Amino acid sequence: MKTFLILALIAVAVSAFPLKEELEESERIHGENGWYIPQEDGSSVWVNMDVAEQWMEAQELLEGRGLTTVPVKFYLYTSSNPTKGTKITTTTKSIGASNFNAAHPTRFVIHGWTQSYTASMNKDIRSAWLSRGDYNVIIVDWARARSVDYATSVMAVSSTGKKVASMINFLKDNHGLNLNDVYVIGHSLGAHVAGYAGKNTNGQVHTIVGLDPALPLFSYNKPNKRLNSGDAWYVESIQTNGGNLGFLKPIGKGAFYPNGGKSQPGCGLDLTGACSHARSTTYYAEAVAQDNFGSIKCGDYESAVSKECGSTYSSVRMGADTNAYMVDGDFYVPVNSNAPFGMIN
């Protein structure tokens, strides 16, 4: 109840209107009239949408006035330093002393709640890209993701995305970065950080990949406050715990639903959804390295979720570079329960 009480108390303080009573469990629709907010111990707490949105509106005022801090660090990995990152800043001295090379494509990778730049997802995705050749892989470390309170981390998403955009703009304006060579890849809350980065870049980044974009405290009906398909020239979403920790409705221009997008094989009961949620990062790293996730085109996302898209594989591979030029729609992705997870007909 900790999160609910905090939200309710703050909402009372900022609103002249009385709050509605907490909805009965039978009336709750996650993402529609409220959210189950994840807790650090893996449990979740229900918060009515009106309560949460009043609190977020008040908190946005504090964020906008600079009354909160949003520390963000950037670590560059290249084929010359594939395992030990170089911390870079938006200064010519810093970039000049690093191995950044504008002639090579650039990939930004952004972690989610409770994580840091040392998280295994960053290592896996970094290694996958560097296994393919010369890339600038920049891992974003945003400290407020490590708040024990999920809502506090959510409120840092916009400001963090703007700081990522500032780094992109600096590299473009001063060090020859070509936006057509830029991918921004984010998991969970990091997917929405990627969206805000795209919204605030001077020009359009080529691709954003949202790895199971977080659902709690984000509304499908407010695309300007979440990752959406207009945030880059091409946006791809890989949705693995839809309707729980991640969105179920399609987020990207290309929306991919491994195993139907709700739960993943090999995760067991997965009562919290954490295993399925994390599989999006594992699948993506494997897709980058092996290009082995075949997909089946669906008429709509409901068909992808129900796995009723037929059995004919398309020419589209989940996570492939070519998707930006040929993909528009929803895809069902068959997967194995163990690595290699990808399946090709």
Indicate residue ranges for each PLM-predicted region:
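Flexible, membrane-associating and regulatory peripheral segments of lipid-active enzymes
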Residues: 2-130, 134-139, 146-152, 156, ...
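The conserved beta1-alpha1 loop
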Residues: 110-112, 187, 212
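Non-catalytic cap/lid and distal C-terminal segments of serine-dependent acyl enzymes
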Residues: 156-157, 193
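Glycine-rich nucleophile elbow surrounding the catalytic serine of serine-hydrolase chemistry
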Residues: 185-196
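Conserved hydrolase catalytic core segment
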Residues: 199-205
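Active-site nucleophile loop of the alpha/beta-hydrolase fold
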Residues: 209-217, 239-243, 261
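Flexible "cap/lid" loop of the alpha/beta hydrolase fold
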Residues: 217-229
